[in-house]
Amino acid sequence: MDALLQLKGIDKAFPGVKALSGAALNVYPGRVMALMGENGAGKSTMMKVLTGIYTRDAGSLLWLGKETTFNGPKSSQEAGIGIIHQELNLIPQLTIAENIFLGREFVNRFGKIDWKKMYAEADQLLAKLNLRFKSDKLVGELSIGDQQMVEIAKVLSFESKVIIMDEPTDALTDTETESLFRVIRELKSQRRGIVYISHRMKEIFEICDDVTVFRDGQFIAEREVATLTEDSLIEMMVGRKLEDQYPHLDNAPGEIRLKVDNLCGPGVNDVSFVLRKGEILGISGLMGAGRTELMKVLYGAMPRTSGYVTLDGHEVVTRSPQDGLANGIVYISEDRKRDGLVLGMSVKENMSLTALDYFSRAGGSLKHKDEQQAVGDFIRLFNVKTPSMEQAIGLLSGGNQQKVAIARGLMTRPKVLILDEPTRGVDVGAKKEIYQLINQFKADGLSIILVSSEMPEVLGMSDRIIVMHEGHLSGEFTREQATQEVLMAAAVGKLNRVNQE
């Protein structure tokens, strides 16, 4: 079968990192191609090369059999390649039709918008997807699932032959997911090709025909989904045994350091758990399960409505992040660029930002020599690759930025270290270094909470694992009990703490 779209031998490098090396992707008419790989495998970079956001360093792109280069998202969109991003690009205050044809409104011979034609065309697009609502409805009145359908209708308005869906079900309910799958089957029957990017195994086996696997920026394989099992697919993605990739330190945890009882807050309902000295507690669950919210309520970044937290036997109340820090709880955010780092400031300034009390004299002036000494020590300990501590942190790679974010947390000498997605967007080499650092903290008696969407990471690094589902704790497992299947069952609510035995 001839591919609608072919990318072959794609290379793309950024300063200090090769994001793609010989990567390839084929998209066939009437078939769904899953694109899979761990975080940092190169999936997003490949999509940006495909849609013209990034220029490829080497390789070829064949569109409908012809060698092509797109010079930006507009040209790829007009050629017939549509992309539906994880974050929806719709304006809630406008109608569905206005969103679909934004910037391309139908104009009559008098130069005025032809509303009648625009709504009629939009209604036709919605009918193609078997949607029951009309295009004069405000987008803000729709559910997230229906908004996603509007994004698909918008893509179809460009006569798209290939549609890329990036984590399309992350914010959807089960019913909305089923509606999406019905639409995907409809698109297949119209001979459109679909690229489906997801980390959810169940969906890959339910809706996809083929799968392409990337690892460390390289093309690993293209296979028919029917010929694979979940285990063989994971093996292709990971490329090595779990224990080789995740160096687990087998130390017995100490006494209880943190005790959480019936904690409630925004997106968090009646959660209880304990954390011991020298223990890594993994927190697993799907997107929207409440993992990050739980950590922010614990740390003081979100309000606690009820429940108790005790640290080393003393009750602590955290009404703000400052309270969390003062009590020895450090939170390293999943979004280091928004919550964690000031990209225009230097490595030194970022690293010492929350620990300035330790480097301040009584009058408030800084002991610059002490600050430089401490920052230099952490740069060496963490093997941060930077020309100097005065380098702007925005110029460092993702892995080195993350090391600085973690080092900053440790400068305050915490008792509890919360790592939320610590290796997101970090290359494989830096991941291994971060895992080794985590083990070092564990050996020093630090209590660590590891929140991660990467199930192998949670399984490989944790001593114990708790699973969140819709704001509740849906399972707690020892390292020996935990498997991908068990964690996934708890994550989708099939297990609960009563029947998990």
From Swiss-Prot:
GO terms for molecular function: ABC-type D-ribose transporter activity; ATP binding; ATP hydrolysis activity. It is a peripheral membrane protein. Pfam families: ABC_tran. It is an enzyme of class 7 (translocase). Gene3D superfamilies: P-loop containing nucleotide triphosphate hydrolases. SMART domains: AAA. The keyword Membrane applies. Residues 5-241, 252-495 form the ABC transporter domain. It comes from the Bacteria. SUPFAM superfamilies: P-loop containing nucleoside triphosphate hydrolases (SSF52540). GO terms for cellular component: plasma membrane. CDD domains: ABC_Carb_Monos_I, ABC_Carb_Monos_II. It is found in: Cell inner membrane. Keywords: ATP-binding, Cell inner membrane, Cell membrane, Membrane, Nucleotide-binding, Repeat, Sugar transport, Translocase, Transport. ATP binds at residues 37-44. InterPro entries: AAA+_ATPase, ABC_carbohydrate_import_ATPase, ABC_transporter-like_ATP-bd, ABC_transporter-like_CS, P-loop_NTPase. PANTHER family: CARBOHYDRATE TRANSPORT ATP-BINDING PROTEIN MG119-RELATED, D-ALLOSE IMPORT ATP-BINDING PROTEIN ALSA-RELATED. Part of the ABC transporter complex RbsABC involved in ribose import. Responsible for energy coupling to the transport system. Belongs to the ABC transporter superfamily. Ribose importer (TC 3.A.1.2.1) family. This is Ribose import ATP-binding protein RbsA. The gene is rbsA.
